[in-house]
Amino acid sequence: RLQANFHHHNLVVASYDIIRTDSDFFLAKHWNYCILDEGHIIKNSKTKLSRVIKEIRANHRLILSGTPIQNNVLELWSLFDFLMPGFLGTEREFTSKFGKPILQSRDAKSSSKEQEAGALAMEALHKQTLPFLLRRVKEDVLQDLPPKIIQDYYCDLSALQVKLYEDFSRSQAKKNIDQSVTSEHKEHGHIFQALQYLRKVCNHPSLVVTPSHPEVHNIINYIDQSKTSLNDIQHSGKLLALKQLLLDCGIGVTESNNSNEDALNSVVSQHRALIFCQLKSMLDMVENTLFKINMPSVTYTRLDGSVPAGSRHNIVQRFNNDPSIDVLLLTTHVGGLGLNLTGADTVIFVEHDWNPMKDLQAMDRAHRIGQKKVVNVYRLIARGTLEEKIMGLQKFKLNIANTVITRDNSSLQSMDTSQLLDLFAVDSGKEDKSKKASDSNKPQSVKNILEGMEELWDTDQYATEYDLDNFMGSLKQ
């Protein structure tokens, strides 16, 4: 119906879903300008949407993106393949000239020659793309925006979590993963299952202890002896830390655990929080185990993939406009992009995305135009586990993005090439210290798993919770 009125208008605004489904209509026209908002959606050149968009005929092309590089520099090639086809060569040529040297220099075992080659490739890429990239950060355009403070909140695993973690290091699954990582034909399915398993162990034992778990009888005996239940929050270092963090923020404080005067003050100065999880099952734990049982005074609402798209705006509006709602529970996938949640001034990440841009986008749901308070961001990290590796990978990817696309991006001098070799070199001091501190309680297999992965899982793999039943069988020693 709208297509029939096309010639009466000078501007067409369309969602990416419409472009994909009605591609014939958009490809049949010759446009003067084609502007992609959140243009990093075409970072994967092999998707149908990317192929359709790159076939659109237009005199001028422009991409708007807060995160043009999320995982690797090959994504930048895909964006330029839309803007200026051929400017960075073919995908194969780009990989050979830029992608491969940069990836090799990232390897912890890379030689000084490989590190230097990676730095030179990065510098060359920066020089070539510099004239076509304009970067503006919030601090440049929103000088009245309150600051955003990011803090890492470390928590220790419970005794049961430590047992499950150590059992994994002695299991057949660990041997299978080690073989997969070191073999020429890596079986990424096993790696993802192992990572998913360990991530759930870091969250709460009940997420992995099912009837098919080989240690289920020993775990039940342990729980019986401790006179607790499997779902108890004391078996999760993260839930205990989350409870304390919320209480420190004045959320969930009642007269029973505070004086009347302090309780009144906590209500007056109370913060409101966004709590992000990767997995819906962990959101369930926070809601059903922490809030309903241990913090019943907390008022909350929830936004995840089970909420119809048409109902999400109403939930956002209700949270922003009703200060009596303490917490909004969200999955990073659903709530991490495009929403305005300035009703909150506290953001808590219970889990973390491999892609640092996803977490940055999520925390900026609160830190945006309209926010009047300082935004405090807390990242719960299970000490001595693969989560510390995840945060290390996040830092590396942010350094890559910030080196290619600098803060100013107005001249070649804006890129400090003297620090590039440090970016790709192993920080031996910190690495050794970390290794000594964590080797006693961190399975060596985790390091092998993560260093052996060439590509980190995407949104679809996050959305699909792997069936771990078959994987459980390989946990037997």
Model-derived features: where do they sit?
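A short helix-loop-helix "switch/interaction" segment in the helical subdomain of ASCE P-loop NTPases
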Residues: 112-120, 150-156
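ASCE P-loop NTPase motor core, strongest for the SF2 helicase catalytic module
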Residues: 1-106, 126-151, 157-163, 167-477
